[in-house]
Amino acid sequence: MIKLKELLELNEMTYNDGASEKHQDKIDRPITLFEDISISLQPFPENTSKKTLEEVKYLSEIEEDVDYVRENDKVKESFGKLHEEFELEYNEDEAGKYLKESSKYIMELKYKFQRPRPHQIADFYGIDLNGVDLDSMKTPSYPSGHATQGYLLGMIYSERYPEYRKEFMKLGDDIAESRIVGKAHFPSDKKAGIELAEKLFQNRK
């Protein structure tokens, strides 16, 4: 039986105490590709909510696929391979700049919300997620940065090469979904990441 005190502590749980110097540098990064706007998202479901517990249980039932998670970890390289497959020109510097500047917004929101990662909530309930541990998973959970960046580049290249829209958007979704398969994100993190990507795409200069 979970005690009220424990539930209150769970609801107050955060990912950590704040941004590292490295992550703060990303938050302070100047912007040149996007309009100077303030982007907001709806808060994530509370840690003690039925929705969050349902998401944790959903993650616990996903079959492990380490290869899929690792293959989709490097966003810039993944899109480079798809360009190469279709013999399309790929400006790696441009892609890198979009990833760097989008990370400013991602990090701002991650540290604003400070949502715990799924394994932190799962541990409270005694649920073993058996997730994949990668260096790119060392930030607060909400929103998913991979979902944001995968969908952002997917939309940019779909606009540029509309005949390959299906393939670019599938790759963007694979990058986003790989973080769910790796148990690194809640499905609601992915949804918020896609919403952020759409806002960034719409506010390009």
Where are these regions (language model features)?
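Interfacial helix-loop-helix junctions of multi-pass membrane proteins
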Residues: 174-202
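Generic structural signal for hydrophobic core residues of well-folded globular domains
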Residues: 157-160, 200, 204
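Hydrophobic alpha-helical bundle signature of multipass membrane enzymes
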Residues: 13-181
